Amino acid sequence: MYLKNISLRGFKSFANKSNMVFEPGISVIVGPNGSGKSNIVDAISWVLGEQSPKTLRGSSMVDVIFKSKKEELAIAEVSLTFDNKDNALPLEFNEVKFTRRVYSRGGSDYFINSSPCRLSDMIDVISEGGIGKGLYTIVSQGQINNIAILKPEERKQIIVEIIGISKHKNRRNKSKNNLEKA
């Protein structure tokens, strides 16, 4: 599984629809200061379930909607399309698209492959694939410094989370408990 495409419209500095296509492997987003690199990372975090406006560098969720002195949009929308040919996500599609919208009047909509869903449904599917806001999918510069100064055992725990071992341990423990009850 890999992120194949990001589509942004009305999100922070991206007033007009913008598409970014990625290939398998490591992708790097580069550009001069103020060109929107951090906003791309914020957009990814937002679709993956980020609920804290502060984490997205705002005071409320509507702050992600494009606003300038000349123009103010009523909606922000971001879609992340993942290649799912390896079935890492628990859906039987070769591509899975997650979309999140927020409206200036308040309220949000969420979609998986253009079908309406709840945020919790989207987060569940994303987490099953081993990605998500709490899973070190996105590591910022400040987090790298913090990880580097951790005690070895704390650092090991983070690595275990990153590679997905904790998810399997939790499933194993749940299965053990179910067997003991039976």
Identify the function of each model-found stretch.
Residues 2-182:
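Gly/Lys-enriched N-terminal cap/neck module of very large, oligomeric protein machines
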